[in-house]
A protein has these predicted regions:
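The C-terminal output helix
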Residues: 117-131
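C-terminal output helix
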Residues: 87-89, 103, 107-117
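Acidic catalytic/metal-coordinating carboxylates
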Residues: 36-37, 63-66, 86
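Short amphipathic alpha-helix used as the core "switch/output" element in two-component signaling
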Residues: 43, 65-77, 93
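Conserved acidic segment of CheY-like receiver
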Residues: 5-17, 21-25, 53
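Active-site beta3 strand of CheY-like receiver
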Residues: 48-54, 59
Length: 138
């Protein structure tokens, strides 16, 4: 059985940011799926569950926090917020709402990759815990 390559979803309305993030994330071997808006993301069927969602706070249709609230059924999905504003109150709100990390653009590549790795580890731990609980019930 071959290992499953993690997939990261990226939601950002800026094409240059999306393309840069896609190249960076692919460079370390992860798969990437990009979305141009919250509406685009919400409308897309997702048969694959990502290890992480990299989410721009400032989107044209919904802000990142509003999108996060719409994902109530997927609270376990780790979210890394990115913002072009040095908006500390927004970062604090994002973290209180359950974000794994909040980064201000421009951020270092290794900061984003480390945030995604942390999110992936969180996803793996939660999956392992769920499997352990399931096995214990049998």
């Amino acid at each position: 059985m071959s290992p499953v390559t993690p997939i990261v979803f990226v939601v950002d309305d800026d094409i240059s940011v999306r393309e840069s993030l896609e190249l960076l994330i692919r460079s370390v071997g992860w798969r990437v799926e990009t979305f141009t808006s919250a509406t685009d993301f919400l409308a897309h069927p997702r048969p694959t569950v990502p290890c992480c969602l990299v989410l721009d706070v400032s989107l044209p249709d919904l802000n990142g926090l509003e999108l996060q609230q719409r994902l109530d059924d997927r609270r376990e999905l780790p979210i890394v917020f990115i913002t072009g504003h040095g908006d500390i109150p927004m970062s604090v709100r994002a973290m209180k709402a359950g974000a794994t990390e909040s980064l201000t653009k421009p951020f270092r590549d290794d900061a984003l990759l480390n945030a995604i790795r942390s999110a992936e580890l969180k996803t793996l731990r939660e999956s392992y815990a769920a499997l352990s609980r399931s096995a214990a019930r049998r």
